[in-house]
Amino acid sequence: ALIHAFLLNEYGHAVYHRKETYSLITREGEKKEKTLTEEQEKAVKALCDSIDRKAYEGFLLKGVTGSGKTEVYLQAARHALEEGGSALILVPEIALTSQMTSYFASIFGDKVVFMHSGLSKGERYNNRMRIMSGESPIVIGSRSAIFMPFKNLRLIVVDEEYDTSYKQGETPRYNGRDAAKVMAVIYHCPIVLGAATPSITTYYAACQGKISLLTMKERVFKTPLPQIHVCDLKENPPIDRSGLISAPLISLLQ
């Protein structure tokens, strides 16, 4: 009645429920900037230059385990934000979403949102609206996150691009990695396919020059890779009931 009598003005404002998802990742020291290695700096520069060109371009970031690929993703996403855009980081498994989200949220805070099928309808709606409004320009999720309503998408990252979990088995069937490539073409932005052991098709495309190859051969802290010993089971037949464990392995375990 007071509104109709012009004694009060009515305003509308959307309020989205926000879970305290990042309560465990704001410990002191986690927000410190990391010093990039020479290989990381080269990769970041290549991606940032591509973001500035505002055109589709494919990259294969081939780095050994522990080489700091995630930090490269983070720095490239930071540049996308500085240019007024958003970034999508895809991971193959839902279980990896929270791990990646925690890493990014320790730097970007509430600008990070995650999307996957394990969320409730209310959570998916809230996160979708935050993405659409640009409130959370960094989106981390599984393959379904590809179809979010992005605002000025400037970077797409597909981590562990070889993983078969990116393939949707049910109708509609699609490969999340390939769908991400199409989205990169639509949004005129670079796409980064990251892996220590890329798929044959992706690596072949890089070798043929269809996409750019960025390599990181050294670990961040110069720690050596674990030594691998090949054991011929014909010469060292398994001696356990399962028929899987050889005598040398049992000896090392004991």
Annotate each predicted stretch with a short phrase:
Residues 1-195, 202, 207-223:
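Accessory, non-ATPase domains that flank or precede helicase/AAA+ motor cores in DNA-metabolism machines
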Residues 74-80, 231-254:
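Conserved interdomain hinge at the start of the Helicase C-terminal
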